[in-house]
């Protein structure tokens, strides 16, 4: 698949993030001061698509955005990165989805998400996917399921329910997992999904080729039918903001996969990519190039 052809389609949210660092979360009916606040480009699908492109792999984005998207600077930014945005749906009456993300001193997070233009996913039908991988991130569960069913068998389907996991019914979650090759979850989502489905590890592996569970500073684990691969956390210079670490891990993992690496190396590339992102505020602020990722892995003698 040479040339300009996009290798990976990312389906799901493109959003504007407002990120706040607080000492601790306030109690109900109280207020706290916030030292600073800034707007960043975010949304799980967009974060992953940008991360993939920065690593030298062509990506495209399938998202619903609002009437404010063109003037937000985000559209121009994606075009300048040469990410294919021809599959964006523009709403004329709703604004681009927005997230207000609060992080405490222990890196716990609370997020308030404005759905906005994302309500239009229900009206859309999935396009034909002409890429090697279709990565389905946070977004509308019904549309995500449609995309997984359309892509499965023709494309490798990667699925990361993220913080939208509670919006999936048991039946819907099971059906999308049955149309997934690579299933990504963090440890909290993995516990929630396993409780909802009453699943053990083996139950997932009867349905997917690989289950990848990320555990923050404790690294990640890749489960396949044959083995369990422990991936260490790659140390960052200094952890400033954990927002977007998961999306960048997935970007690194999938980019390495389309470059032909085995799953262990994919996990290491994912972990190293995430180690850069946490060094700055914002999901896309400090996304590394492929060379920088490889250099950091070599520095850790991995």
UniProtKB/Swiss-Prot annotation:
InterPro entries: Carboh/pur_kinase_PfkB_CS, PfkB_dom, Ribo/fructo_kinase, Ribokinase-like. Can use Mg(2+) and Mn(2+) with equal efficiency in vitro, and to a lesser extent, Ni(2+). Substrate binds at residues 17, 33, 43, 47, 111-113, 163, 247. The record marks 250 as: Transition state stabilizer. GO terms for molecular function: ATP binding; cytidine kinase activity; guanosine kinase activity; inosine kinase activity; magnesium ion binding; nucleoside kinase activity. Keywords: ATP-binding, Kinase, Magnesium, Manganese, Nucleotide-binding, Transferase. Its cofactor is Mg(2+); Mn(2+). Optimum pH is 7.0. 50% of activity is found at pH 6.1 and 8.2. It holds the Pfam family PfkB. Gene3D superfamilies: 3.40.1190.20. Homodimer. Catalyzes the phosphorylation of a wide range of nucleosides to yield nucleoside monophosphates. Shows the highest activity for inosine, guanosine and cytidine, but very poor kinase activity with adenosine, thymidine, uridine and xanthosine. ATP is the best phosphate donor, but can also use ITP and GTP. Shows extremely low activity with fructose-6-phosphate. This is Nucleoside kinase. It comes from Methanocaldococcus jannaschii (strain ATCC 43067 / DSM 2661 / JAL-1 / JCM 10045 / NBRC 100440) (Methanococcus jannaschii). The lineage of its organism: Archaea, Methanobacteriati, Methanobacteriota, Methanomada group, Methanococci.
């Amino acid at each position: 698949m040479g040339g300009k052809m996009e290798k990976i389609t990312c389906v799901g949210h493109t959003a504007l993030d407002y990120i706040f660092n607080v000492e601790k979360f306030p109690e109900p009916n109280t207020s706290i001061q916030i030292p600073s606040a800034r707007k960043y480009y975010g949304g799980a699908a967009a974060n992953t698509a940008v991360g993939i492109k920065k690593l030298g792999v062509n990506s495209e984005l399938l998202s619903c955005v609002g009437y404010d998207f063109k003037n937000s600077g985000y559209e121009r930014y994606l075009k300048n990165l040469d990410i294919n945005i021809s599959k964006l749906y523009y709403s004329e009456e709703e604004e681009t989805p927005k997230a207000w993300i609060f992080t405490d001193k222990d890196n716990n997070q609370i997020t308030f998400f404005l759905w906005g233009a994302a309500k239009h996913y229900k009206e859309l039908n999935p396009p034909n996917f002409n890429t090697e991988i279709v990565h389905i991130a946070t977004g509308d569960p019904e549309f995500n399921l449609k995309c997984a069913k359309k892509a499965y068998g023709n494309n490798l389907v990667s699925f990361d329910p993220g913080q939208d996991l509670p919006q999936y019914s048991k039946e819907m979650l099971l059906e999308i997992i049955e149309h997934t090759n690579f299933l990504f979850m963090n440890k909290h989502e993995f516990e929630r999904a396993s409780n909802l489905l009453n699943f053990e590890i083996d139950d997932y592996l009867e349905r997917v080729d690989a289950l990848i569970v990320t555990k923050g500073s404790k690294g990640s684990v890749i489960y396949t039918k044959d083995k369990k691969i422990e991936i260490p956390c790659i140390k960052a210079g200094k952890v400033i903001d954990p927002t977007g670490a998961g999306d960048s891990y997935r970007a690194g993992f999938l980019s390495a996969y389309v470059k032909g690496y085995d799953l262990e190396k994919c996990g290491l590339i994912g972990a190293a990519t995430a180690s850069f992102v946490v060094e700055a505020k914002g999901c896309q602020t400090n996304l590394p190039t492929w060379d920088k990722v490889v250099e950091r892995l070599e520095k850790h003698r991995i």
